[in-house]
Structure formats: structure tokens, C-alpha cells
Swiss-Prot record:
Keyword terms: ATP synthesis, Cell inner membrane, Cell membrane, CF(1), Hydrogen ion transport, Ion transport, Membrane, Transport
Name of the molecule in the record: ATP synthase gamma chain
InterPro entries reported for this sequence: ATP_synth_F1_ATPase_gsu (IPR035968), ATP_synth_F1_gsu (IPR000131)
GO CC terms, sorted: plasma membrane; proton-transporting ATP synthase complex
Protein family per UniProt: Belongs to the ATPase gamma chain family.
The organism's place on the tree of life at top rank: Bacteria
One Gene Ontology term from the biological process aspect of the record: proton motive force-driven plasma membrane ATP synthesis
Subunit structure, interactors included: F-type ATPases have 2 components, CF(1) - the catalytic core - and CF(0) - the membrane proton channel. CF(1) has five subunits: alpha(3), beta(3), gamma(1), delta(1), epsilon(1). CF(0) has three main subunits: a, b and c.
Membrane topology of this protein: Peripheral membrane protein
HAMAP family to which the protein is assigned, alphabetical: ATP_synth_gamma_bact
GO molecular function: ATP binding; proton-transporting ATP synthase activity, rotational mechanism
CDD domains for the chain: F1-ATPase_gamma
Function: Produces ATP from ADP in the presence of a proton gradient across the membrane. The gamma chain is believed to be important in regulating ATPase activity and the flow of protons through the CF(0) complex.
């Protein structure tokens, strides 16, 4: 009987866990849908800014601006700024592992070349994975649970802009997971600085600039950096929720399979007990 009690307790426990994983799956699905909508709404703006930057590069307009040269030209022998986007919470499969693995590989390559490195880490999981080995490289760390997206984007942008203005960085790269679908997230390494020239110069014909110089370049650079961070953040959030939804769906299905096996085992144990009791009753009646 104690065995039956243990089985019933375990079944109850697994069912309770299954309810939690199912609820988390539904919450992540809802969040993912909302973020996908935000991505769709922001894509036009981000693409427009990127095309304008490519147009400026194509006609060498940035050479008219001292500020522009800081953002479009490589500054040799300065810091390599790596911005690492991870999640604040776990239970999302290999979502963070792929990012951390790539960052560690790139840091190793930069160290072998004798390059200077600085890290801006977004998300608790990335910080926990990198702080022990690369604490001396960490410039800033942002907890996603303690800061709004707008403020996060602004602060990261200010750090990038300040470093570029002061000629402190050779390049700036951002790591994030690009959303494809709920089951597929693509680890992405995207260069922010220096701004790369587009292979397609056809966009140049679409723009007519009313004025030139510092004001245009400065405003456009600020918008560009802001849009790149916003894009990476939205993609990473959608990927995180997709990964978590898939992980929780798998956990829910595994719990269902385990419950079926435990119920079968419970029924067999009950059947064995009943059969034993019947045999004892029959044996007792025959003895009388």
C-alpha cells in the first residue's frame, strides 16, 4: 500500500508541475505574439534609417563632418566594444548558451591578437556566465528586470556614442538571437561601428539632402545607433519567448508521458494487490 501512496503522490506532483509549464508556455506564446507585432511595426523605420546611412556612405558625405568620420572610419588600436544580449531568466533551452559560446570564442581571438576588449552585458544570464572569467573586461551590466526598454536603449546608445566621439573604440559589435520562428533562433553577430557600406548603392538616388554638415550627420548617427539597439533588443526578446515557449511545450509533453507511465504502473500495482487478495480469499475458503 505504501508503494501505491508513493505513486499517487508522484502523479500529483507531476500534474502540478505540468500545470505550471503549460501556463508558462501560454504566457510566452502571448508575449512572443506581442513582440512580433512590435518588430513588424518597427521594421520600416529601421530599414529606412539603414538605407539613409548607406546612402551617406555611398556618396562619401560623412567626410564633410568630423563627427561622421569618427563613426564611419576605423580607429586603429583602440577598444573592441562587445554588446552581449542574453535573457534575465532561464528555462529557455540553449537560447543563452549559443550567444555565450560565440562571445567567448571572439574574446579568445581578440586576446590572441592582443586587442583591447570591453563588454556591455544585457541580461542576468550573460553576466553570470561571463563575470568569473572576464570580470576585468565588463564595462557595464544591465538587469532587464530593473530597467525599461526605452531607458536601456538610451543608456547603451550613450555609451556607444560617447566612446566613438572620444575615439575610444575601433569597432562595436552586438550579439543577439534573431527570431525566425518559435522553434528557430539564429545567433547573430552584427557590427554597429564603424558603419559598413552597403553593397547596393541604388538607394542613393532616392534621397535629396536639403542641407549638409554636422547637424544632419549627428542626428542621423544617433537615430541609427538607437535603431540598431532597438532592433537587436526586440529580436532577442521574441527569440527568448519563442525558445521558452518551445521548452515549456516539450516539458509539458514530457510530463504527460511520465504521468501516463506512472498511471500504468499504479494500475498494475493495484491489480497485483487485488489479485493477491483474491488468491488469499480463495485459499482461505478452500481450507474451511
Amino acid at each position: 500500500m505504501s508503494n501505491l501512496k508513493q505513486l499517487r503522490t508522484r502523479i500529483k506532483s507531476v500534474k502540478s508541475t505540468q500545470k505550471i509549464t503549460k501556463a508558462m508556455q501560454l504566457v510566452s506564446a502571448s508575449k512572443m505574439t506581442k513582440i512580433k507585432s512590435q518588430i513588424a511595426n518597427s521594421n520600416f523605420y529601421i530599414e529606412a534609417i539603414s538605407k539613409m546611412m548607406s546612402a551617406i556612405l555611398a556618396i562619401d558625405m560623412y567626410e564633410l563632418s568630423i563627427e561622421g568620420q569618427k563613426f564611419f572610419n576605423t580607429v586603429p588600436n583602440k577598444v573592441n566594444l562587445l554588446i552581449v544580449m542574453t535573457s534575465q531568466r532561464g528555462l529557455c533551452g540553449t537560447f543563452n548558451y549559443n550567444i555565450i559560446k560565440q562571445v567567448k570564442n571572439d574574446i579568445k581571438d581578440l586576446e590572441n591578437k592582443g586587442k583591447q576588449i570591453k563588454l556591455i552585458i544585457i541580461g542576468k544570464k550573460g553576466y553570470e556566465a561571463l563575470k568569473r572569467q572576464y570580470a576585468n573586461y565588463i564595462d557595464s551590466y544591465f538587469e532587464l528586470s530593473k530597467i525599461h526598454d526605452e531607458k536601456l536603449i538610451l543608456q547603451v546608445k550613450q555609451k556607444i556614442m560617447s566612446a566613438a566621439y572620444n575615439l575610444e573604440v575601433s569597432n562595436c559589435v552586438i550579439y543577439f538571437n534573431k527570431f525566425k520562428n518559435a522553434m528557430t533562433q539564429i545567433m547573430t553577430r552584427q557590427q554597429i561601428l564603424p558603419v559598413e557600406k552597403s553593397k547596393d548603392d541604388s538607394t542613393v538616388k532616392k534621397y535629396h539632402y536639403e542641407y549638409e554638415g554636422e547637424t544632419l550627420i549627428s542626428n542621423l548617427i544617433s537615430l541609427y545607433v538607437n535603431s540598431q539597439i532597438n532592433y537587436a533588443l526586440l529580436q532577442n526578446r521574441a527569440s527568448e519567448e519563442g525558445a521558452r515557449m518551445t521548452a515549456m511545450e516539450n516539458a509539458t509533453n514530457n510530463a504527460n508521458d511520465l504521468i501516463s507511465k506512472l498511471v500504468l504502473k499504479l494500475n498494475r500495482s493495484r491489480q497485483a494487490i487485488i489479485t493477491k487478495e483474491l488468491i488469499e480469499i480463495i485459499a482461505g475458503s478452500e481450507a474451511v
